[in-house]
């Protein structure tokens, strides 16, 4: 999951106010930071984040544990807030056109390999996250795990109308066309 990291300690939406945060070049991601009271900044490549933080161009960025650690950003922005605002799914795709040209036994082999690959990738990613988190914690960075109330506050910022979005919520601006998908995901989450 991706979380925010900054040069200032924070544990609430109010603590995001005024922070310049490097974001992916994606309007929804920028707006997400803006509704939290920060300013989403684009145009800074992943390899430039460390120096942009050191120079004061930005106050932080957002990413996962391995990237935060591997890029050395944890040395420049020592406060990591575990808000886990996005999760990027890892997807395996196969062309229906190609699969239709294979015999059934080969298609089954490919499907089985995909299942095994999924389990292997999850294991390796979990190991990398654990290793990166350990390095960051041992370096003395401050890791903030949100309270249930603070987590709910971050979620509410996404669903409540925002001046930053002309009175719309982030969900209204970006989720309307995908409401059936959002509802299906929420239903799965409720089952756990």
Sequence positions of predicted segments:
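N-terminal secretory/targeting leader peptides
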Residues: 1-192
């Amino acid at each position: 999951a991706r979380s925010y990291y900054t040069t200032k300690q924070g544990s609430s939406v109010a603590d995001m106010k005024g922070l310049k945060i490097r974001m992916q070049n994606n309007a929804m991601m920028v707006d997400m930071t803006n509704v939290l009271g920060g300013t989403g900044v684009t145009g800074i490549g992943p390899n430039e984040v460390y120096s942009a933080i050191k120079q004061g161009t930005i106050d932080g960025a957002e990413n996962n544990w391995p990237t935060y650690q591997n890029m050395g950003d944890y040395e420049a922005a020592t406060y990591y807030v575990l808000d886990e605002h996005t999760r990027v799914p890892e997807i395996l795709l196969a062309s229906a056109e190609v699969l239709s040209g294979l015999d059934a036994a080969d298609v089954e082999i490919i499907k089985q390999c995909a299942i095994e690959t999924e389990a292997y990738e999850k294991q390796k990613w979990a190991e990398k996250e654990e290793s990166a988190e350990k390095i960051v914690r041992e370096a003395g960075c401050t890791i903030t795990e949100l309270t249930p109330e603070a987590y709910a506050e971050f979620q509410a910022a996404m669903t409540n109308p925002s001046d930053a979005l002309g009175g719309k919520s982030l969900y209204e601006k970006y989720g309307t066309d995908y409401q059936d998908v959002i509802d299906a995901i929420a239903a799965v989450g409720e089952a756990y």
